[in-house]
């Protein structure tokens, strides 16, 4: 489906952005999150310049995204290592089973 114009409010300013209808709720949640971050920053830093607040919020969000990407990379690497270890364990068990079968002459079919 094609994007449709949506009006949102960011820190007291109206913005019209194009958004697919199925992503409208997510856009509104993102706008609410950004508004909350800007309000929190304004209180915490006592910065009143909106442009400066927006840049600080953007840096914070970018930092959080970078951290999450690193976590995802680390998790994926950990899972790959566990899968390799599991695969080696299974292969070794199959080899050992084959050796046991050869020694005893049993067949597990």
Curated annotation (Swiss-Prot):
SUPFAM superfamilies: Cell division protein ZapA-like. Keywords: Cell cycle, Cell division, Coiled coil, Cytoplasm, Septation. InterPro entries: Cell_div_ZapA-like, Cell_div_ZapA-like_sf, Cell_div_ZapA_eubact, Cell_div_ZapA_N. Activator of cell division through the inhibition of FtsZ GTPase activity, therefore promoting FtsZ assembly into bundles of protofilaments necessary for the formation of the division Z ring. It is recruited early at mid-cell but it is not essential for cell division. The keyword Disulfide bond does not apply. Belongs to the ZapA family. Type 1 subfamily. The keyword Coiled coil applies. Disulfide bonds: none annotated. Homodimer. Interacts with FtsZ. It comes from the Bacteria. Residues 21-97 form a coiled coil. One of its GO terms (biological process) is FtsZ-dependent cytokinesis. This is Cell division protein ZapA. GO terms for cellular component: cell division site; cell septum; cytosol; plasma membrane. It is found in: Cytoplasm. PANTHER family: CELL DIVISION PROTEIN ZAPA (PTHR34981:SF1).
